[in-house]
Amino acid sequence: QVNFTPSW
């Protein structure tokens, strides 16, 4: 499971 959280 891959979680990507952008900081913008």
Swiss-Prot record:
GO terms for molecular function: hormone activity. The modification Tryptophan amide is found at W8. The lineage of its organism: Eukaryota, Metazoa, Ecdysozoa, Arthropoda, Hexapoda. This is Adipokinetic hormone. The modification Pyrrolidone carboxylic acid is found at Q1. This hormone, released from cells in the corpora cardiaca, causes release of diglycerides from the fat body and stimulation of muscles to use these diglycerides as an energy source during energy-demanding processes. Keywords: Amidation, Flight, Hormone, Neuropeptide, Pyrrolidone carboxylic acid, Secreted. GO terms for biological process: flight behavior; neuropeptide signaling pathway.
